[in-house]
Amino acid sequence: MMKRETFKIADIYVPVKRRATLNPSTVQQLAQDMLQNGQKSPILVRRDGDRFVLVEGLHRLEACKALGEETILGYLVQAAKH
């Protein structure tokens, strides 16, 4: 079973291809939900040297950024580079 961890948002790299799928209205809706209910679903990241690369959870990550958060809940996974 994976262990949920807290990651510094500044240490998470978002690949360019993944950034292209960003929907600002989804980010806004998630940010509102997170204000009321907290972060429900952790993101997925993989290690790449000294940083982490986002695997899943772009909108959750951006919602946390919009709320001024410095950390986010996530799981560290073993994933192939795309």
What are these regions (language model features)?
Residues M1-Q78:
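Short, charged/polar connector segments at secondary-structure boundaries
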Residues K81-H82:
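Short, charged recognition helix plus adjacent turn
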